[in-house]
């Protein structure tokens, strides 16, 4: 029953733990549905307070199309006619398509999340993210929200995460998030999806 889904989930986790199984769930950090809306109280949501006319700002949740972006928009033109495009603004797709006219080969039903660096700027932008060389650099908002999400599921007894499209997320985030998760649960398990021929590399990874 939909209204009992959290209770059912908790019961499943308990049964797994009782027989010595460690439950893992899917963690999708790169993108969300274009219709995504969080329903957890007391937490910031992706995109809250964003300037819909600015392509990139470190504290924004998404990347927004501008008047200089390719294509004839607004509105956003989606290729299949099944989803209504955003009418007064547009957001970059989950596969980094910066256009008002994403194709059917783009992930047009998804939206790219912003990890505090402009993915169009390359390596120089990655150097602005917080890491051991710049510990005083402000932790981007999306990082903080993702840490809250991981913490929530760990609090329910989840012991690990299968990380979707892990190579599209900055290495600096993974180091930060995994370290924080291991403070909460030292043996927490992270498994990265190996999606293409460059599965060893993430933004900022020297491999």
List the predicted regions and their residue ranges.
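Substrate-binding/active-site clefts of carbohydrate-active enzymes
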Residues: 1-152
């Amino acid at each position: 029953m939909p209204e009992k889904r959290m209770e059912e989930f908790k019961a499943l986790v308990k049964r797994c733990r009782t027989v010595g199984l460690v439950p893992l769930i899917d963690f999708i950090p790169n993108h969300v549905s274009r219709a995504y809306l969080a329903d957890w109280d007391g937490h910031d949501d992706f995109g809250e307070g964003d300037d819909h006319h600015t392509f990139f700002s470190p504290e924004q949740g998404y990347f927004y199309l501008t008047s200089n972006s390719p294509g004839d928009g607004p509105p956003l033109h989606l290729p299949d006619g099944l989803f209504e495009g955003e009418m007064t603004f547009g957001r970059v797709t989950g596969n980094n398509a910066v256009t008002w006219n994403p194709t059917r080969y783009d992930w047009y039903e998804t939206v790219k999340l912003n990890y505090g660096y402009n993915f169009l700027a390359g390596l120089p932008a990655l150097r602005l993210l917080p890491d051991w060389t710049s510990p005083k650099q402000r932790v981007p908002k999306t990082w903080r929200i993702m840490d809250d999400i991981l913490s929530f599921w760990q609090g329910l007894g989840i012991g690990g995460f299968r990380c979707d499209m892990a190579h599209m997320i900055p290495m600096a985030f993974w180091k930060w998030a995994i370290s924080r998760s291991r403070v909460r649960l030292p043996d927490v398990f992270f498994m990265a999806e190996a999606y293409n021929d460059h599965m060893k590399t993430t933004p900022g990874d020297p491999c």
